[in-house]
Amino acid sequence: MAIFFLPLVLPGFAPRSEDSFKSPARFSWSYLNPSKLKKRSVGLSTETNAHGQAYFTLEGHKFMIVGGSIHYFRVPREYWKDRLLKLQACGFNTVTTYIPWNLHEQERGKFDFSEILDLEAYVLLAKTLGLWVILRPGPYICAEVDLGGLPSWLLRNPGSNLRTTNKDFIEAVDKYFDHLIPKILPLQYRRGGPVIAVQVENEYGSFRNDKNYMEYIKKALLNRGIVELLLTSDNESGIRIGSVKGALATINVNSFIKDSFVKLHRMQNDKPIMIMEYWTGWYDSWGSKHTEKSANEIRRTIYRFFSYGLSFNVYMFHGGTNFGFINGGYHENGHTNVVTSYDYDAVLSEAGDYTEKYFKLRKLFASGSARPLPPLPRLIPKAVYPSVNLSFYLPLFDILPYLNKPVMLETPVTMENLPINNGSGQPFGLVLYETSICFGGGLSASVHDSAQVFLNDKSIGILDENNEFLHIPKIQGCQLLRILVENQGRINFSWRIQSEQKGLNEAVTINGTLLRNFTIYSLDMKMSFFERLRSASWRIAPKTYKGPAFYWGSLNVGSFPTDTFLHLPNWHYGFVFINGRNLGRYWDIGPQKTLYLPGPWLHPEDNDVIVFEKIEKGFYIQTRKKPQLQN
């Protein structure tokens, strides 16, 4: 296999023409299979030959990383095998995944590696199927998830200085790594596992404000027993300042950018080029257009990677879904949120279906493979089920008895600082603040991200980061002021992560008078809440209703449930829960118009459907065989 790059640097290794690409010996790695390889001593390494050409080796054999990203936490566990088999059948030899700290440790000191978060099971499954694994444990990962994968309880202390060697932050990282890394150790290559490399942090070159931080994180991995190749990952502008001695610097790109590769090569000219992220598409945000990228462009770019002998990872091979409240956000002319679908216009669709990109890449990879690629796994069928009539409802303020006991505070605090969840605050969802007022006037409150304001149960307006003032009309006697605040997704990139507390701060005033004595309810929408809600006295839903409310109906799927997509005509903004599972947010501004409903999350026959709609009741819910990801 001819490895390397750039004829201007290494004469005699010019890129091949497309015709000559079909050399059958070029990509024969059948002897390097994690489920069969018995001798384990060297692991993934970098070497340079007598001509100055650098390349990867695995157990002493030349090796090219052909990777694709699939995040286990965005895919139903029942479909991990399906997605990994499709990765392999396309011609890839490696799967990469981030590890989200905020999902594994939602409450400080309470770790969850079960079900969809069972990292060890995911990695061992990849090994069984014959795939190598690259892990990206952060602690920060970006990945368009809430706070870039950092747990929200870190924001309880405003002086923590995330992603630095600040004492509070590092202590939290150390405790997390003390729990996480022992799970990874037996999965490493030299211990018989499939993990051939581990990434140190993520894109620190775009953030860096602590020269000692990357060295600390690297040592935190090494001191706990990580022995495989270490990597860093940055955009071109950050590859030098985001690097750390002892780790291979890799680059993230949107296309084949020769100058970027030259820059990386000059920085470490005795190392092979590795593209840690080649973006096959992009994420969508609410109110924007759906992003698409040409399949022909993807094929051409990856062909050029091959022709130059560059190792690469496709981000994303399969994007999956931002189930629940896990989506992130970013700041561009105000706060903007990532949609529920993480389809990403990836090689495999959100529901695991083949795309034009998939077939073009499979054909390309097959042309350079010494052995036939595995057969294509069958597609998972999609179904159309009878429409769901949401016949019963509960206005928001009727469900308060079914929530956990409220918190009584003199002045409001952000959701992260609520004294709940063993001192960890509230990570996701909504918060309802209530206090009694006896006069009207100008209400001023700093809100993150959006708030609906009520007098008793009557809506009087909206607050958000661009509108922190609302006039309250003259009132008779005293009334209950209610402010319902939603966390729409914490920013996942840039220095702004330091100040991403959600909810209300202490300064809530009317005509400059500070409001006091708040009752605060947490609406985190956990499974236990929906179990309690089953016993509520649901009412017959009217034809129309304005204001936040829960609606309940039943979806009948027959004896053999399978995947479908939910479409909510005439509904405006809210969340859908199937048998207590949060499918994610819907919003009529688009571009996403359907929600993916995995078949394994359905029961035979009847399934509970609960919709929390914030604005105004719609009519019914339809099911479809295909998604609608653009207006």
From Swiss-Prot:
Signal peptide residues on this chain, from the entry's feature table: none
Record EC number: 3.2.1.-
Family indicated by similarity: Belongs to the glycosyl hydrolase 35 family.
TM spans (from-to): none
Residue numbers annotated as active site: E203 (proton donor), E277 (nucleophile)
Gene (name only): Glb1l3
GO molecular function: beta-galactosidase activity
This protein's name: Beta-galactosidase-1-like protein 3
The entry's keywords: Glycosidase, Hydrolase
Any GO BP: galactose catabolic process
EC main group: hydrolase
The keyword Repressor belongs to this UniProt entry's keyword annotation: no
Recorded coiled-coil stretches: none
Record-level GO cellular component terms: vacuole
Gene3D superfamilies: Galactose-binding domain-like, Glycosidases
Source species: Rattus norvegicus (Rat)
PROSITE patterns linked to this entry: GLYCOSYL_HYDROL_F35
